[in-house]
Amino acid sequence: MKILISGSSGFVGSRVLHQWQGRAELFTFPRGFLAAADESAIRRFVETVQPDVILHLAALSDTGYCQQHPEDSRRANVDVPLWMARAAAETGAKLVAFSSDQVYSGAAQEGPLPETLSLSPSNIYGQHKLEAEQRVLEVLPDAVFLRVPWMYDLPGYQLPIRGNLPLNLLRAALRGTPVQFSAHDWRGISFVREVIENLYPALSLPGGVYNFGSSNDRSMVETARQFAELLGISVAIEITDWHRNLRMDGCKATAQGITFCSTQEGFARCLREYNLSGGLR
């Protein structure tokens, strides 16, 4: 199988290349290509590679930046996925793309949220990710969108790293500064390696939208405390009162044979894989 990957130098894409070595023929867009490319340039590149699957991981995912720069967000998060879809349609490739749990921002419903929920995202990033889903599926009904949660990894293997829950907690502990979390903020958080493991079978999913990540029945206050305890560190947590529910119901993916650990199980696995099961003590 020939797979063309966008965002291959990013947090997830670099780990896809690392974990999938030898599993398929992996091709990437040149670094910086998508930042300047128009639709015709993308189409020509896809035609040259002739992939079986386009795995579109590239995005502009800084929600604050997207809020302040909506045109940049629209190009990266709506236009480019649509151009990918048209190129896939013309070449006969399957398109599998990341969406985000941020499409659920603004949801009033409690508990795990299904893919069928009527949505009205409260931030620009979530609005654009939802629009991309809708517009791409109109052009390419067999495209697959995976709504992923906040992901994390620990530094290692010379792979790029970015801010995430365990690293944020570690920095706060080292600096002696408090971190803020709400007892009314609910979301799953996933170990990126598990996401990438499940991403390979997801290439064969029927077209549509799928929630794709770990469950979590704990608030972010409880989750942060659990992560800190597993790390063996002491962190001061300031409890705030703002409300958000991004918890995703994973039953649709589970019905296709794709399952995830809970948020807490996933972090315990992460520590085992880095030989840190006893924490950092």
Positions of predicted regions on the chain:
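Mid/C-terminal beta-alpha module of Rossmann-like enzyme folds, strongest
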Residues: 11, 15, 195-243, 279-281
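NAD(P)H-binding glycine-rich loop region in Rossmannoid oxidoreductase-like domains
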Residues: 36-76
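NAD(P)-dependent short-chain dehydrogenase/reductase
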Residues: 134-187
